[in-house]
């Protein structure tokens, strides 16, 4: 059965809620994308915070509206901080999202991500290779790049969602978002989104922030994917290449509104 296409009208309504709430999003993300991630959250309407010291991370996870764990530049000290934050988020019922960057290529981060799954993420966002690997299936991948397609990883995403209780977003040319029972697809975007560093990581931050919203988590996560794809498509139409794409993307996300999405 083909997944239903996520409603842009629902995405527009969710964006209105998102901007009213402006979720305080604790981003424990990788060094390469911190600035772009923070700016993406601000442009979308959320409020970013980057707190990484273990003692502070534990404390802040209970204060934040949502938490992102991105293992892109994982170190042992950073893993300690991430573990402390997710443990506190679990206790405080702060929704947290896992971005298992390059989990299929490197053993240490794979073991770490599998350990964190016991702390019940609200959402997991990754490319096809990452989702396949996290689900325990063979995957092709070169670091953060994927050699698998999102649709090929959909059964793994559905199984992972049932196993963990998380909403799983496997993203690519078409994004698929599933809770293990219901699945929706999200279209849009542009190839330029793959020609700059950080769009996937920034998407994970917006997904994390969306998990702070009331209502259905699957719909909220799919809406976050929709906002990013619509902004990417709009920015590509105004860009001459990767260098002009990033500021155009932030502008497009900032100006995204209900009328443009319906």
Swiss-Prot record:
Keyword Metal-binding: yes
Gene Ontology molecular function, alphabetical: ATP binding; hydroxyethylthiazole kinase activity; magnesium ion binding
Coiled coil region boundaries: none
Keyword Iron-sulfur part of the UniProt annotation: no
Cited InterPro entries: Hyethyz_kinase, Ribokinase-like
Associated pathway: Cofactor biosynthesis; thiamine diphosphate biosynthesis; 4-methyl-5-(2-phosphoethyl)-thiazole from 5-(2-hydroxyethyl)-4-methylthiazole: step 1/1
Catalytic activity: 5-(2-hydroxyethyl)-4-methylthiazole + ATP = 4-methyl-5-(2-phosphooxyethyl)-thiazole + ADP + H(+)
Swiss-Prot/TrEMBL GO biological process terms: thiamine biosynthetic process; thiamine diphosphate biosynthetic process
Binding site residues for substrate: 50, 198
Enzyme class of the recorded protein, top EC level: transferase
Cofactor list: Mg(2+)
CDD domains hit by this protein: THZ_kinase (cd01170)
Chain residues that bind ATP: 125, 171
Keywords: ATP-binding, Kinase, Magnesium, Metal-binding, Nucleotide-binding, Thiamine biosynthesis, Transferase
Enzyme Commission (EC) number: 2.7.1.50
Family: Belongs to the Thz kinase family.
Protein role: Catalyzes the phosphorylation of the hydroxyl group of 4-methyl-5-beta-hydroxyethylthiazole (THZ).
NCBIfam families: PRK09355.1, thiM
Name recorded for this polypeptide: Hydroxyethylthiazole kinase
Organism: Citrobacter koseri (strain ATCC BAA-895 / CDC 4225-83 / SGSC4696)
Organismal lineage: Bacteria, Pseudomonadati, Pseudomonadota, Gammaproteobacteria, Enterobacterales
